[in-house]
Amino acid sequence: METDELRRRFASSPVARLSTVRPDGRPHIVPIVFALVGDTLFSAVDAKPKRSRDLQRLANVRADPRCALLVDHYEDDWRRLWWVRADGAAEVVEAPPAEHPGIQALVRRFLQYRDEPPSGPLLVVTVQRWTGWASTS
């Protein structure tokens, strides 16, 4: 698949799986909602219930920015299966203003954020490599 098609498929997914590296080298993977703008992905710590706003994924990124994100499409007709992976480097923006382009992109994408925009830390991933697969049978 061409890069534009990989981006299009990735952006069409409502959720991605974010994989980061724990300080001890073990992988850590969680589902996230996100907005994609070009080769930059944004995901915020929002008001959904959590034990803490200082999440493991944020601690991992602060220690090691390497990450990968995966979206996929599955259905019983295996001729329609596909997946897209985005490999990149992440950073944490601790207190982004409401005008931050990432916050604005999330507000545009998710109705839930229109009444209560995310106010917690913002994860910003610069995608360095797109890869994917689609069934051809």
Segments and roles (model prediction):
Residues L6, R53-N60, E99-L106:
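Amphipathic alpha-helical interface surfaces
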Residues M1, Y74-S137:
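Charged, gly/pro-rich active-site loop segments
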Residues P14-K50, L69-D72, W82:
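Short beta-strand segments
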Residues A44-V45, R51-C67:
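Compact nucleic-acid interaction/catalytic patches
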Residues M1-R17:
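Short, basic/aromatic recognition patches
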